[in-house]
Structures are given as structure tokens and as C-alpha cells.
Amino acid sequence: MDPRYGAQPMPPRRSPSPGHPVQPGYQLDDNPFDDGRYGQYGPSSQHLAMPGHDPHGRLPTPSDHLSLNAAQSVDNLAGYGPPSGGDYAINPEAHHDAYYNQPYEPRPQHQGYDQGYEQDYDVPDNRPMLPHQHSDVPSEQYQDPPQQGGGIQRRKTVKQFALYRGNLVFDCRVPPLLLQQNPHGERDEFTHMRYSAATCDPNDFHDHDFTLRQRLFSKPRHTELFIVVTMYNEDEILFARTMTGVFKNIEYMCNRPNSKTWGKDAWKKIVVCVVSDGRSKINPRTRALLAGMGVYQEGIAKQHVNDKAVTAHIYEYTTQTHLQIKNNVVQLVHRRQPVQMLFCLKEKNAKKINSHRWFFNAFGRVLDPNICVLLDAGTRPGGSSIYHLWKAFDLEPMCGGACGEIKAMLGTGGRYLLNPLVAAQNFEYKMSNILDKPLESAFGFISVLPGAFSAYRYVALQNDKNGKGPLEKYFLGETLHGGSEAGLFESNMYLAEDRILCFELVTKRNCHWILQYVKSATGETDVPDTVTELVLQRRRWLNGSFFAAIYAIVHFLDFLRSDHTFLRKFAFFIEFIFNTINMIFAWFAIGNFFLVFKILTTSLGDDTLLGRTGEILGVVFTWLYGVFLITCFVLSLGNRPAGSGRLYTAMCWFWAIIMIYLMFAAVFISVKAIIADVNDENGFNISDIFKNKVFYMLIISLMSTYGIWLIASLIMLDPWHMVTSFAQYMLLTPTFTNVLNVYAFCNTHDVSWGTKGDDKVEELPSVNTKDGTGKTDLPDEGDLDAQYQREVAVFAQKFVEVKSAPTPSQLQERQMDYYRGVRTGVVLLWMVTNFGLAAIVLSSAGLDRISTKEDKEAEQLSRSNIYMSIVLWSVAGLSAFKFIGAMWFLVVRMFRGV
């Protein structure tokens, strides 16, 4: 008997256990069947028992001899009596899920798990996993012709199958090589991978009778945490970085024995969903890594089912193989904590928001989780960060969403900080998490929960009975970007769709959900390390956040429909006034920066400061300022950042020099003002420094800002960015203001995410059924190990990029970049020379300040008269020259006669 049940009597028709618990795997039905309405045979009419016990007391069959019945049907099972293919029947009324799937308790076993194994217990291949009326499934074996170059000779088996609830669903055995590395039962979630070919829209997934493995156990598993990792074409390093953090969090929760929710079997309450955006876009090395974990298998996916196109390929497997990164190579680590994996490989590339629709509307509706965690591939959560996010919801029942601290990845020893762009972004991220996020969390409304690392309460996101609500507004962005009727405002707004989701969640009708910032939860992500990458990233961020902020301000009255208290609504009102002021400053950022520059550089020309040197420097920098700002506009309106990288880099250097000059001007002017006070004939008092208007305006205001940054960082016990990144941030501030803002606003017409592309991909086989049954070819059992070894070898070595010859489209793009570059140079030369001519003639643009003559008005009048004379007499001379030519033509014509 099962030792966990003591001396309790065995239920009817259950064979005595030889000292090991029966492990029949998961039972394929959605209902727990707790009401005992199925008579003496238990729920066998709707619920199947699986043979997994030897009546003679032998140990379970070793995993490497399990038979593969991948195409076995479990459809149309009603009406069956007692199972005829097994030696016992299990009554779910007396046993719960923990009985059928034992808690993870690794114990040492020899290679191959053949302790006590007897050869005569081998199960023939045609014996089904589940009892079925026609258990001997006919099959036809054939072999592909030998591949050239010594490739693996692939064997396939044509198997008969029946649809499961009208859908194509296979249970496929995982490779024996993988089984030998991990503990497992006779036939359970560790030995078989489940494949489903979804032929519907994600909104219809549940209505089309698709389900997931967690709902198929005799006692369906409750999903407390549902984690999604969205990816596009990230390589295996980025993917492994994220999955390593997720696995560590699951291990952390399983090692909390005193928790009411978590503990040894915590992994059963957590499902990790990986959604890849397009079969043609997934990185082959990442796909091979998933195969190495047992989550993916090549050769079983189908293109069409009964002439219906497959929209997503869904693979389910409980893996005990974790990952680690050593020397920039991903390695598999076996015999670790089990993790329930769900891999959704979308057939077409449809953007990240569509991936979230599969997560929330398709899989979420089936699993009905409590908390949903959103991650981007490449973001590595801290070892206990996901737990701390969950804890925020557990402690605050009205917490509808939460986010942690996003950190910039700095590399070993912070070596990435040597790149000024990385250091500046590190400072940005830190100050946002020290000042912005805590402020918004105190009010209860965070303007944006970053999609790279955030969490939501699933019930809080649900729409009302009329289909209106947070998710409805959130997924509206998918149709807006795909349709021609979308306005430019809405399209840009939904570039920051996570901001819309936050707003709609807090303003949800008749609810009072709040958003929180969890500082103890951290997520590390890589940041752009080149100017071109930064420009492209911030284009979407700036445009999306700006238009989403306008949306929130315009729809501020939507807070009145919520059920928040008057005090909370008043707090929201104060926060929105604050956000409006910030948006106004962001709108006038370029103008404000130029005015500060002009005032400081002009002041340096005073005789008490730099005098004539200051005037000349001011004019030179003003001209350069105008030239580079015009260059920003010209590049933004027509050039690709990738094709103008050198120009953007040059602009970064120029704006850094401008910032150095401004900082020098502020300090120099203040010091001179203090010296003047010290040398005052009326005496000097320390209080006179603070009464000095120049010192008060420049130094006190600046030091107040920087002092607040430093004090807040010290209070948060996170001050190191002030030492390592402050200088780089200050030098790149003009670049953020001028270059990034100009490019963003000049490209408001571009509402793409930069990931939509060609979906041409290798065609998969199709299947057709008649009366719910059909035939298909699947990888043969003998080829599983060879296929597994081939997949593992893909990522076993460091990736070496092979430079291939550029494609015709790439060559054409390079040619267009060259043409755009020439056009940019011509336009800039044309604009600058014309502007220079006007400035010289009119003595404007600072030229009047460097004149040495005392009567500047007379000089300007004289210069204007000379200019007018030159222009007018030049026009007259040109006309006269034309007249002479015309007269000569008439003379020649008169003598020629024609």
C-alpha cells in the first residue's frame, strides 16, 4: 500500500502495491469526479485508468523501454465499462493528485534506472498508453532515403490516430537519453510530451475544446502562478538567462516548507509559458535548447488539420532539466526541480501583443491562474523576485498589478559601465526606481508596469459581461496596428499598450484596484550599447508614452467610474497634475535647453567674465548648435539610424562638448559672482553668498537637484550609480533631449514595432481525418535519441557568426543608405550656406557681437547697402548678358536665313 495512507483499506479493484506507489501518470479528463456517481467501477465511463503496476511485485519498467504511442486517441471515450487492458482500476474518490504524481524526491539511481529490471517485462510497441477498444493500432514503417553527407537516417512510422475532442492532440514519448538523466515514473508527465495543434484564434481556444495538461489530472491542478516569457528571435543565451532566473525562483518557492501556499510541491502550482512569435522567426539555437529540455520535438507539428490552418503549435512537458551559462555556452543541468512548461510556437509573426493574447485569453482562460507574471526573453529575474511579486498580491488583496526594479545589465565587475551609453541608461533606470516608481506607488497608480518584468492579478484584468474592461482595451492595440482605419494618435498610443492596461485597470468600473512597486523584486535586462539601437528603442518608448499620457489626462474623469475612496481619487488628481506638468516640460525640452545654453554662453561674453573670448566662443557654439540640430531633423526625416551611425555618434560627442561648456559656464559665472561679493567694499558675510542672485539661480538650484538624487540614493541604500554613472548621464543629457526627442517626433508616422517581417517558412505536413480518425507519420522511437543528440549539439558550442554574402535586398538597402547620406549632405550644405549668407548680411546670429567697430548700426547699414547693390546690379548684369546673346542670335539668323 502507499505508505502515505497508513493502514487504510484499499479501495475496490485496486491491486496491492509492492511497496512503491502506483504512478499511472495523469488521467485525461477535466473533472475531479468527487461525487461518486459512477458506481463500482469509479469514473471509468468517462475517466480512464492506466496500467502502470506489475501484479508480481516487480519494479516499474525502465524508462528506456517504454513504448511510444504518440498518436493514441483519447477521444469519444464515453460508454466504456471497466478497463480491460489494465490489472487494476483506480478510484479518484480515494486518492488525490499527489498520489498519481508523487512529490519530487530525487534519490540516487544507477545509469539507466535498471534496478531490479526484468527483461520479460518489456511492453510491446503496439500496446496503448490508455485502455482502448482497439488497442492494436495499425502502423506502417518506412525509412527516408539516406541523407547525403552522413546525416542521420530518419525513420518514421505511419500511425493511426483519432481526434481528441475534435482536435489533433498527441502524447509523444521523450527521448530515452533524456529520461535516463532524470527521475520519472512508469508513464507520467516526465516521460511524455503533449502536442496540440491549435486551429483557432486565441480568443476561441477554450470554446473549441482545447485544454491543457493541468486540467487533465484526476484532480486538476490549481495554477497559482502563471509565468509567460515572450520572445521573437532571441538567441539561446538571452533565453537561458531568463529561464535560469525563473528556475531559481521556482526552487526558492519549493524550499519554503513553512509557507501555506508553497513548499515541496510548489512546482505543481506554477506553469511557465514560453510564447515564440512566429515559426519562421525563432532562433534555431533557442529551439534546440527547448528540445534539450524535452519541451520541443521536431517532426510532429502539422500545417493543416482537416484543411484548417494551424495557428499555434503547443507543446507541454514537465521538465527536470534546468540551464546554466558557462563561458557564454548554455549547458543542461539534469535532476533538478520539476517545472511545468508550456511552449507555444505561433505559426505566424503577429507581434508581442498577440503573444499576450494567447497567454491571457487562450491559456489563462483554461488554467484560471491567480497571478500572472510577464517577462521578456533576456530579462533575468532575481533569485526570489517572482516570489516577492507574488507576496505583494498576497499581502494586499486589492493589488491588481505590481512591478519590480528593472536593472541595467552591467557585466562582470561592471565592465559594461565603460560604455557611456550603458552608464547613462543605468543612471536613468536607477533614479526612476528610486524616485519615480516609489512616488507613483504611494499614490496607488503607476503610469507603466514594464512588460519586461511585471505581474497582474488575473481576475482584475477580466472584462465585464459586456466584454468591456482592461484586456479589451489592451488588445485593441493589436487590431489598430493591423488595420487601415486606425488613427495616428491611437496607433502611437498603443506602442505603449502597457500604459493603457495600467490606466484601465485602476479605473475599472465599480472596482478599486491599485498598482504597487516592489523594490525587493528585481529584473536585470541588457540595454542598447550603440547610438543607433538606442534611437530606435526610444522612438517607440517616447512616442508611446507621450500619446498614452495624453490619453490618460484626457480620460481622467474615468476615475470617477471606479469604486475608489474619495481620498484615493483626490490622490490620483494630485498625481495627474504632477504628470501633466512633467509632460509640458517634456514638450518644451528642446526650447528650454537652447534658452539655457544661449543665456549662459551670452553671459560669458561680459567684460567681467571672458570678455571677447567668451563672445567668440558663444558665436561659434551657437552656429554649431544650429548646424547639429538641423542635422538631427534632416536625419530623422529621411535616414535610417542604422545607415547613419557615424553621424549620430558625432552628434553625441558634440552635445557632450556643449554640456561640458555649459557646466563650466555655470560654475565660472557663480565663482566670479562670489569673488565680487568677497571684494565688496562694504564687507563680506557668508550669508551674502546665498543672497547673490547668480549663485542662488545657478548653483543652489542645480545642487538642490543633485543633492536630492544623492540623498534619496543613500536612503534607498543604493548610491553607487552616483559614483559610476552620474558623469556619463550628465554628458549625454543633451543627446537624450535633442537627438532622441527629435527622432521620435519626426517619426510619429512609424507605428511599427520593428519585428514584423516575412513569414516564409518550411511547409509542414498536413493531416485529414474521416469520422474522426486518420493517419500521420511521426518520428520513430529508434530515432528519438539521435534527434535529441543532434539538437543538443546545436547549442553545445559557442555561436560563431558566419558572414554570408549580402542578399540582393541588403545590397539595395545599402545603396539606399548611400543615396540618403548624399542627400543629407546636400540638404545640410544648402541650408547652412543660405543661413550663413543671411546672418552675415544682417549681422545676426551673434555676428554683431564680435564686430570691433564702435558704430555697429552704421556698419550694419553699410553692409546692407553693399549687399543690395551687389544683388541688384548682378541681376541687371545677368539680364544684360542674356540680352546681348539674344541680339547676337538675331544677327546670325538674319545672315543664315533660317
UniProtKB/Swiss-Prot annotation:
This is Chitin synthase 1. GO terms for molecular function: chitin synthase activity. The gene is CHS1. Keywords: Cell membrane, Cell wall biogenesis/degradation, Glycoprotein, Glycosyltransferase, Membrane, Transferase, Transmembrane, Transmembrane helix, Virulence. It catalyses: [(1->4)-N-acetyl-beta-D-glucosaminyl](n) + UDP-N-acetyl-alpha-D-glucosamine = [(1->4)-N-acetyl-beta-D-glucosaminyl](n+1) + UDP + H(+). It comes from Gibberella zeae (strain ATCC MYA-4620 / CBS 123657 / FGSC 9075 / NRRL 31084 / PH-1). GO terms for biological process: cell wall organization; chitin biosynthetic process. Residues 64-75, 136-146 have a biased composition (Polar residues). Belongs to the chitin synthase family. Class I subfamily. PANTHER family: CHITIN SYNTHASE, CHITIN SYNTHASE 1.
